[in-house]
Amino acid sequence: MPTAAAAKSTAAKSTPPTSNQKIAHARAAEPVLVKGRREFFKYRDLGVDQASEGAMRAQVMMASQGMSRPTGWHYHECEGQFIYMMKGWVDLQFEDGRTIRVEEGDSLYIPGYLRHNEIRTSDTMEILEVSVPGKMGTTPCEPPPGFKD
């Protein structure tokens, strides 16, 4: 009489659905720098946009000097944006009136189309940024009521 373990090993095995997505492995020793949406950052592409066929984008944003002025109110055309602060800090204002400082080791999720404004940063900064989908537009907008640009 077969044991439960033997019966389990002979059970039909599931076949996963197929996907054209690929593995992305970005080596720190061979960074791929790309043009980004802000001139005061350097952007390191992590290969996720291409590997996921545009489903997601991951990059590291690096600054070697603090912001001289706020970015201005804007929103991103995406489902969502996630950041993880690897080094330094950034202060962000949100349309609901909150100002949040994201410091080293902190993370923040920003829903798509939520108005916000980066107002200050540390002198050096590195942020892992992930967006869904990979293509994320940035649209300048008017400040929410009660805020100045």
PLM feature spans:
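Short acidic-glycine-tyrosine-enriched beta hairpin
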Residues: D96-Y113
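Conserved catalytic-core motifs of eukaryotic protein kinase domains, centered on the activation segment
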Residues: E95-G97, R120-T121
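Short, conserved beta-strand element in jelly-roll/cupin
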Residues: V60-S64, Y75-L92, V130-P133
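Short, surface-exposed secondary-structure boundary micro-motifs
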Residues: Y113-L114, I119
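A short, N-terminal "cap"/entry segment at the start of jelly-roll beta-barrel domains
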Residues: M1-Q65, P140-D149
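A short hydrophobic beta-strand segment most commonly corresponding to one strand
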Residues: M56-V60, S107-Y109, S122-C141
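A short beta-loop-beta micro-motif enriched in histidine and acidic residues
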Residues: A51-M56, G66-F82, D96
